[in-house]
C-alpha cells in the first residue's frame, strides 16, 4: 500500500478557555447529538476564539459537505436490515414450499394425495379469496376422513376424490342392478306378480325411475349454470354472479327436479298398470301421492328459501364490502409490483457483488464456483418445469396458478402479521428512497408501474396526509393498515357467513313447519280443526315467545339492515355502558346473529345483545373522516388579546411544520368568563385522520398538548390562581396596603438618569390585576427553543420538529404503527394450535420422505450389483438432491448480502493501524499476508 503524496491533516482542536456555559438566550441549543450553530455570534478572528472558546472549533477544510447525515428513519432501517432480509427470505421459503407442494401433487397425477391430506388441505386456498366470495356457500354434506384405516374407507375416499363421471357411475350402477332383480323377476319368472294391485314389473320400473330421476336432476342442476350465465349476460353486466348463484343452488334444484319427476311419474305408472285393469286410484296410492306432494311442496319452499338467502348475502356483500374489497385488492396488487421491483433491484445488486468477488478467485475455487452456478441453473430450471406443470394442472382444474417465485405469495405471507407488514414497508423504503433524502417522492415509484396513472394512484394510497412525500413511518403505518384491513374484511365476511347460516337455519325451521302443516292438511280432513285448536294454544302462550321473537327480529334488523360496524372497527357505544355508565370505546371482535363481542381498550372482552344495541347511538371511528378536537384551557381573567393571538399564531406555526400529522388550521373560542376570575379558552385543532388507530391518536394528541403547554409557558399565559393573593413567585405572601412588587426582568435594571429618579411606583389603584399584559411570575427558558436561535431558525424556515429537545409524542411514535390495542384478530386464530399442527405436519412429511428415500436407496443398492450407473428413480428424488446441493449456494448468496463488508472492515482496520504507526511487525506481516498484493504495488513506492 502506498502513502498518498498529499496527506489530509488531522483535525486541529485549539485550546480554549474553560468556562461555565451560560444559560442566557444567546447561547445556541443542542438538539440531540447535533450542534446548532448560532449565526448571531462572530465566527472569525482571535477575539471570537477567545470569547467563544467554550465551543468546539473544528477545521472543516477537508470535510465532505455533500454527504448528508443519516436520518433516524434511515438509521432504523439500516439497523433492522438483517432481520428484515431474514423475514423476507422466510416468507419466500414458505410461499415456495406451499406452491411446490401443490405442484408436486399435480405432477404426480393425484391432487388429493394421501400424503398431503394428512398434513394440510390439498389446495392452500387463501382465506381472503375464500371469504370474499359474495355467495353463501354450504359446507359439504360428506367429508371423508383424512386418514382412512380400512380398505373400504380408502376406496370410498378415492371414489369421492375422483371425477364426477366416475363418482356418478359408481353410485348409480349398484342400486340399479339391485332394483333390476325384481324387475326381471316380474318380467320373466312371475308376470302376474303384483304389489298393491300394481304389476311387479311396473312397480320395479317406477322404483328405477325414482332412483334414476335423482341423478338426472343432479346432472341437469350441474349443467344449469352454463345456460344461466348465457341468459344473464343478455340482461345484466354481472353474469358471473348469477352463474355462481346457480352453482350454489345445485342441491336444492336437484331435490326439486327429483321430486317433480317422482310426482309426475307416480300416478300414471300406478293407475295404468293395475293387475285387474281398473284405472281407478287406490287408497294407498292417494295417501302416498299426498306424501309425495307434501315433500314436493317442501322442496319448492326450500328452493325459494335458499334463493332468497343467496340474494340477501349478495346484496349485503355488495352494499357493505364490495368497495373495501376492491380497494384492498388494488393495494395488495400495488405492494406486489413494488416488492417485485425491489426484489429484482436487490438481486441485481447481489449479482453485481458476486461478479465483483469472482474476479479475485483462482485455483481450486473456480470449479466449485462454476459447479455452484450449475446447481443454481438446474434449480431454476426445475422451478420453471414445476411452474409449467402447475400451469397445466391449473388449466385442467380451471384455477389460476402462480409460479413459485410469484411476489404476490410473498406479500400475502408478510401481510399476515404486523411485524411482517413493517418488514415489507422497510424493504420498500430501502429500495425507493433516494440517497440524501428521508422520504419517497412520486417520481421514485414510477419505475415499478406500467403507467404514470397507476403510479400516482399507488402513491396517493401511501400518502395519507397528502403532503407530497412518504416517510418510512408513514409507509409502515399504511402497510400495517393494509394487512389489518385484509384481516378485518376476512373476519367480517366469515362472521357474515356464520350469521347467514344461522338465519338459514331459522328459515329452514319455518319451511319445515309449513311443510308439516301442508302434510297434515292433505292427509286428513279433520286436521283443520286440530290446527285451529293448536293455533289457539300457541296464541295463548304468545307471552312466552314474544320476547324471543322480538329479540330475533331486532337482531336481524340490526345486523342486516342497519349494520353500524364491522369486525375490527373502533366504535363508541352511547348508553349505560362503560365504568361511568356514560358509554365507552370498544373494538368489534366478533359479530353473531344475536350478540356482538367487543374488546375494550384495556383488553377486556364484552358481549352485548344486538337487540339492545339496536336502540343505542353508535359512533363508528373507522367510517368517520378526519376529526377535530377541542382542548379547553382555563386561563386567568385579564389575559390580553395579544397573548391569545400569539398563542394561536404559535400553534399555527406548529401545525404547519407538522403537516404530516395535522391540518393547517387552528380555531380559538372563548367559552365562558367566570366571575371576572377565569376565562375558558377552547383551542380546536384538526387531525389528518380518524381515531381508528389509538396509538396514532395518542401520538398526535401528545404532540399538540406538549406544544400547547410550551407555547403557554413561552407567551406567559397563566392560570386563574395566579390572580390569588400570594401567588407570585418572587414574593410568595401578601401584605395589605403594600404596593405590588416590581416586574421581574430578564436583564439587569437600566437607569438612564444615574439613579437620581427612583423607579416608578404604581398608585394604590394601579394593581397587578389591572395590568394583564405583565406577568409577575418568572418565565423559565423553553424546552423547545431559546432566544435568538429560535428567531434565526424561524427566519431560515427550519421546522419546529428539527429543534425539539424531547419527543413530544411521549414515546408513542414508535408504537403508533403497531396499534396493539386495536388488534382483535390474533385472538381469533389459535396461533399455538396452528403452529403445533404445522410442526406435526412437517414432521410427518419428513418421516415419510425419509422412509421413501430409504426404500429407494435400498432398491438402488440391490440394483447396483447389476449395473455401475446409478440413476435417480424419480423426478422428486432428483429434485430433492439438487435442492440440498443448491442450499449452500443460496445460503452463501444470502450471507454475502448480510456480511459483505466483514473482510473489508478487517483490512481497513489493519491499514489504519499501519498509517498511525501503532501496529507491530507481526501485525503488519499478518496484515500483509492477508491482503492481496495488487499488480501496481511496488515496495519502492512507499513513502515514509
UniProtKB/Swiss-Prot annotation:
The UniProt annotation puts the region (Disordered) at 1-52, 94-129, 738-782, 847-944
* Residue sites binding Ca(2+) per the record: 463, 465, 467, 469, 474
The chain positions of domain EF-hand read 450-485
Subcellular location(s) per record: Endoplasmic reticulum membrane
Protein family? Belongs to the MscS (TC 1.A.23) family.
Q: What does the record note as the disruption phenotype of the gene behind this chain?
A: Does not affect growth, morphology and rate of germination of germlings under normal or hypotonic conditions. Leads to a very moderate increase in sensitivity to CaCl(2).
Specify residue ranges for compositional bias: Basic and acidic residues. 94-110
Biased composition of type Basic residues is found at 897-907
Mapped to this chain, the residue ranges on the Cytoplasmic side of the membrane are: 1-168, 216-248, 312-502, 548-944
Q: Does the keyword Calcium apply?
A: yes
> Residue ranges, Lumenal compartment?
190-194, 270-290, 524-526
Xref: InterPro entries: EF-hand-dom_pair, EF_Hand_1_Ca_BS, EF_hand_dom, LSM_dom_sf, MscS-like_plants/fungi, MscS_beta-dom_sf, MscS_channel_2nd
Source organism phylogeny: Eukaryota, Fungi, Dikarya, Ascomycota, Pezizomycotina
UniProt lists compositionally biased (Polar residues) regions at 855-876
Q: Does the keyword Ion transport apply?
A: yes
Tell me, what is one Gene Ontology molecular-function annotation carried by this entry? calcium channel activity
Give the protein's recorded name.
Mechanosensitive ion channel protein A
UniProt keyword list: Calcium, Calcium channel, Calcium transport, Endoplasmic reticulum, Ion channel, Ion transport, Membrane, Translocase, Transmembrane, Transmembrane helix, Transport
Predominantly, its location class is endoplasmic reticulum
Check the record and name the Pfam families matching this protein.
Answer: MS_channel_2nd
Instruction: Give the EC class as a word.
Output: translocase
Q: Which residues cross the membrane?
A: 169-189, 195-215, 249-269, 291-311, 503-523, 527-547
What UniProt notes about the protein's domains is: EF-hand domain is involved in the detection of calcium concentration.
Any one Gene Ontology cellular component term annotated for this protein: perinuclear endoplasmic reticulum
